[in-house]
């Protein structure tokens, strides 16, 4: 895991702008001892936020926990965060609805915090 890099080894950020949203990529570890976004990691398919949740990966519980964690982490309403890919995979893509430029700034600030 890259504790502070804003980009993976490919030189890309773990998010991109969409239509009135940002699409962010996460590598999820369920059944963890805590709920946390811990940094940026290179997954081989590109960079992703390394994320842990306490929820188990059954009946969508870990996916729901990830959506709630990301909403809280970014300070956005829960309804603005939705899983769009990776329902049964560790690699997830979330759509975060809102002003893409503002969300980009929030995500970059969070990545910068990993460097401290």
Predicted regions span which residues?
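Contiguous, often N-terminal, cationic amphipathic patches that form binding interfaces
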Residues: 1-59, 63-68, 78, 82-88, ...
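The alpha-helix within a helix-turn-helix
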Residues: 71
């Amino acid at each position: 895991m890259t504790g502070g890099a804003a980009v993976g080894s490919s030189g890309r950020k773990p998010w991109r702008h969409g239509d009135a949203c940002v699409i962010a990529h996460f590598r999820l570890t369920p059944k963890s001892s805590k709920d946390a976004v811990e940094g940026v990691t290179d997954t081989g398919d590109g960079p992703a936020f390394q994320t842990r949740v306490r929820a188990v990966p059954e009946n969508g519980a870990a996916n729901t926990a990830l959506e709630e964690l990301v909403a809280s982490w970014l300070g956005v309403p829960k309804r603005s965060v939705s899983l769009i890919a990776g329902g049964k995979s560790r690699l997830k893509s979330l759509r975060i609805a809102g002003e893409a430029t503002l969300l980009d700034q929030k995500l970059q600030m969070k990545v910068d915090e990993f460097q401290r």
